[in-house]
UniProtKB/Swiss-Prot annotation:
Transmembrane segments: none annotated. One of its GO terms (cellular component) is phagocytic vesicle. Ca(2+) 2 binds at residues 56, 58, 60, 62, 67. Keywords: Actin-binding, Calcium, Metal-binding, Repeat. It comes from the Eukaryota. InterPro entries: Actinin_actin-bd_CS, CH_dom, CH_dom_sf, EF-hand-dom_pair, EF_Hand_1_Ca_BS, EF_hand_dom, Fimbrin/Plastin. Binds to actin. Residues 366-608 are annotated as: Actin-binding 2. The gene is fimA. GO terms for molecular function: actin filament binding; calcium ion binding. One of its GO terms (biological process) is actin filament network formation. Residues 116-232, 260-365, 379-488, 501-608 form the Calponin-homology (CH) domain. This is Fimbrin. Residues 102-365 are annotated as: Actin-binding 1.
């Protein structure tokens, strides 16, 4: 028996789930090796099996949660040298800098982790990105030492500004509380920050406004990284860079490139330039393969303008620390000395090296333009669904809607998150798949996803798993819309306590009850043309949370420009009062009934949770 508290067990369960990628309740050798590799730890298959064997009490070749807890108990009782190797691996995945006190510990005293290297990198990035922001001039630049960064995040203003830097116009800054900041107004900013982060695809399931106000370091670090990463990755796609077509391998199509996560695209881009420079070296990761600085030296020389003064003298230096210094000197000549210190290169700090390379691509892609390549741009609806899915923490992160869902696994994950207990994991085919039969396994997953939808009374007439596998856009969007609606309705139903599912008509009736009580004109439904002005939404927000809408900001001319301003105001104000809104201002102006439904439903949730 272990003597951990309930809170500690909950924390360990979260760690366990980080390893247990397929959710089968066991950590396999493959899963352990995969996550250690992601964290920059080079381990062989034999080493991984030995780690597991050391703690696998029932001898089945994997680690269940009970065994996991026993390992952590041993680690607590022994010194680091005497702890099982697996326990050390868990700590490495967690991070390297444990912090105590209110900023990083739970009430039970469980310590959380973050690395000073990350903190310094994020601070430098923020200081540069937001240097000209007049609202932040009193707190920038943020010093790198101590907890000053977390204190700077206290009132929500800094992270809201960072979100707008990553994805411009996410937040209507007219709604930010910038002056006379009491506890209530600070909390409003933090609620706006969290709901806006969700809207751009951040997974903030376990973060509340109070965590940010209290300066809980590990949570602020995690959110900051997600925001920065989304901003760095936002333009690394075929829509913004059709010249990425040049990264295709022989026999591949554009579809093959769309399947790749951004990390893989960046590795291809890196290797493309290594090959163009005549180097035989190739990188397969952002950790071990870049430690000696050789590949960085070649890459920087290859992508640099000829007059930038970038050179390759680092290759003549045997000392790796000095080589890394040279790399960053060259990066500085390109205006790209971001995220890394020399030791981050030498130690192969995966996360920061990934950010460094992404920033290099964004500033100096150095790819020749291509002609006659048809690029289908992501629609607003597709992006909204993608951000919603990612905000729920689906794994892997969805970069392309149809490539990300065609094997059925993400859809099944969504059903599992929206309707806990619905999914029978024994019916799910998890990768890796054998070459023979892989297609059938994926189609079986898609068929199971469709069956789950039917079990939830979704309208799926004429849709089967093969449609999803074939990336039929119309049918895939139909399923995703019903999942999004199901998510909103399931929360509403739970809050109502009636056990009776909330219908669309109920949401219209509630909306009109709010408008009527406020003496405002009612709507005929979610297609009502008056919604295009944004005013009915602002009226409902004001009815739910009196005083939240500044009447001086509401435009009444009915012009397209004023309507859009009102829509932006409505979306950000709704998020500020606690609504999780994925609808965009354009959805309001164009009166997209599906998105309008979710917005009013989210406002009803706010009223129920008062």
């Amino acid at each position: 028996m272990t003597n951990f508290s309930e809170s500690e067990i909950s924390e360990f369960k979260a760690s366990f789930n980080q390893f247990d990628e397929n959710g089968d309740g066991q950590i396999s050798a493959l899963e352990l090796q995969k996550i250690l590799t992601k964290c920059g730890e080079k381990v062989t298959g034999v080493e991984v099996r030995d780690m597991i064997k050391e703690v696998d009490t029932d001898g089945n070749g994997s680690i269940d949660f009970k065994e996991f807890l026993q390992v952590m108990q041993k680690a607590r009782q022994h010194s680091a040298n005497a702890s099982p190797a697996f326990a050390s691996a868990v700590k490495k995945v967690g991070a390297v800098n444990t912090i105590g006190g209110y900023s990083g510990s739970t009430a039970s005293g469980v310590q959380h982790s973050y690395s000073d290297e990350e903190k310094v990198a994020y601070i430098d990035w923020i200081n540069n990105c937001l240097a000209k922001d007049v609202d932040l001039k009193s707190r920038l630049p943020i010093p790198e030492d101590g907890d000053k960064f977390f204190a700077a995040c206290n009132d929500g203003l800094l992270l809201c500004k960072l979100i707008n830097d990553a994805v411009p116009d996410t937040i209507d800054e007219r709604v930010l509380n910038k002056k006379n900041l009491n506890a209530f107004r600070i909390n409003e900013n933090q609620v706006l920050c969290i709901n806006s982060a969700k809207a751009i695809g951040c997974n903030v399931v376990n973060i509340g406004a109070g965590d940010l106000v209290e300066g809980r370091a590990h949570l602020i670090m995690g959110l900051t990284w997600q925001i920065i990463k989304i901003g760095l990755f936002a333009r690394i796609n075929l829509t913004n860079h059709p010249e990425l077509y040049r990264l295709l391998h022989d026999g591949e199509t554009i579809e093959d490139l769309l399947k790749l996560p951004v990390e893989e695209i960046l590795l291809r881009w890196f290797n493309y330039h290594l090959a163009a420079a005549g180097s035989q070296r190739r990188v397969k990761n952002f950790s071990g393969d870049i430690k000696d600085s050789e590949c960085y030296t070649i890459l920087l020389k290859q992508i640099a303008p000829k007059d930038a003064g970038v050179e390759t003298s680092a290759l003549n230096i045997s000392n790796l620390d000095q080589r890394a210094v040279k790399v960053l000197e060259n990066a500085d000549k390109l205006g790209c000395k971001k995220f890394l210190k020399p030791k981050d290169i030498v130690t192969g700090f995966q996360k920061l090296n990934l950010a460094f390379v992404a920033n290099l691509f964004n500033t100096h892609p150095a790819l020749e333009p291509v002609e006659d390549v048809v690029i289908i741009e992501e629609t607003r609806e597709e992006k909204t669904f993608r951000n919603w899915m990612n905000s729920l923490g689906v794994d892997p992160f969805v970069n392309n809607l149809y490539e990300g869902t065609y094997d059925g696994l993400i859809l099944i994950q969504l059903f599992d998150k929206i309707y806990p207990g619905l999914v029978d994991h024994k019916k799910v085919n998890y990768p890796p798949y054998k070459a023979m039969g892989a297609e059938m396994k994926k189609i079986e997953n898609c068929n199971y996803a469709i069956q789950l939808g039917k079990d939830c009374k979704y309208s799926l007439v004429g849709i089967d798993g093969k449609n999803v596998y074939d990336k039929n856009k119309t049918l895939t969007l139909s399923i995703l819309w019903q999942l999004m609606r199901g998510h909103v309705i399931s929360i509403l139903t739970a809050l109502s306590g009636s056990g009776k599912p909330i219908a669309d008509a109920d949401i219209v009736n509630w909306t009109n009850s709010k408008l009527s009580a406020a003496g405002k004109k009612q709507i005929s439904g979610f297609k009502d043309s008056t919604i295009s002005t944004g005013i009915p939404i602002l009226d409902v927000i004001e009815a739910v949370r009196p005083g939240s809408v500044d009447p001086a900001l509401v435009a009444t001319s009915g012009s397209a420009e004023d309507n859009l301003l009102n829509a932006k105001l409505a979306v950000s104000t709704a998020r500020k009062v606690g609504a999780v809104v994925f609808a965009l201002p354009e959805d309001i102006v164009e009166v997209k009934p599906k998105m309008v439904l979710t917005l009013f439903a989210s406002l009803w949730q706010v009223e129920m949770t008062k």
